Design a protein with these regions (language model features):
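Helix-loop junctions and terminal segments of transmembrane helices
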Residues: 1-27, 81-86
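Interfacial segments at transmembrane-helix termini and the short loops linking adjacent helices
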Residues: 41-72, 144, 177
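Short runs within selected transmembrane alpha-helices of multi-pass transporters and secretion channels
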Residues: 39, 62-112, 117-142
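Hydrophobic alpha-helical transmembrane segments of multipass membrane transporters and ion channels
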Residues: 28-36, 69, 73, 160-168
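Transmembrane helical elements of multi-pass membrane transporters/channels
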Residues: 1-8, 29-32, 66, 70, ...
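Juxtamembrane/transmembrane-helix interface segments of polytopic membrane transporters
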Residues: 45-49, 108, 112, 120, ...
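Transmembrane alpha-helical segments of multi-pass transport proteins
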Residues: 100, 153-178
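Membrane-water interface at loop-to-transmembrane-helix junctions
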Residues: 19-34, 58-66, 84-96, 100, ...
Length: 178
């Protein structure tokens, strides 16, 4: 949906500040939607998995959280991918994703024996954080010119909404004795 607009901006050599404004505007909306889903899962996911899968699947909740939470960052920064494609600078991202896969596979192989499925999920979590959050955000900031500190300042101002939703869900569960 954003690709035509972003491509037009890239062709016109739009200044990075305008890309930043779009990145923040769309990212805030995506954060609201995704934080609602993640908050609902944090509040109700354990009970949902217990009802759906039954006994013996308690670790599935923690596995889901370890994978779901770091994936929220590239989801709320999806506009950046459109910007990379429009500027024809997506090769670096592809290389980072290859490194994420190698790191994930290596850590999973190393940790799954000792820590089981939680170790595998932790390996995925660490690989995502290093690649998708640290390295890709650095690339957006240093090489593309998107003001990532300003983006995170805007997102962090919205975090109380997510915390309130999670707290309300927790109180509902507590009141219902679930």
């Amino acid at each position: 949906v954003l690709m035509p607009k972003v491509t037009k901006m890239a062709v016109k050599n739009t200044p990075p500040s305008e890309f930043t404004a779009l990145f923040i505007k769309v990212g805030r909306l995506q954060f609201l939607l995704i934080s609602f889903i993640v908050s609902a899962f944090v509040a109700f996911g354990r009970q949902f998995i217990a009802l759906w899968a039954g006994a013996g699947y308690e670790d599935a909740y923690y596995v889901a959280l370890l994978v779901m939470i770091p994936v929220t960052v590239p989801l709320i920064q999806n506009t950046g991918l459109n910007i990379l494609y429009a500027m024809n600078k997506h090769q670096f991202r592809s290389a980072v994703y290859l490194c994420i896969a190698v790191l994930n596979a290596g850590l999973t192989f190393w940790w799954v024996e000792e820590y089981g499925i939680i170790g595998a999920a932790m390996a995925t979590c660490i690989a995502y954080v290093v690649g998708n959050i640290l390295i890709i955000n650095w690339y957006y900031y240093k090489k593309i010119g998107i003001d990532i500190p300003l983006f995170w300042k805007n997102i962090l101002h919205m975090c109380p909404v997510m915390l309130v939703m999670g707290t309300v869900g927790w109180f509902i569960l507590d009141a219902l004795h679930i």
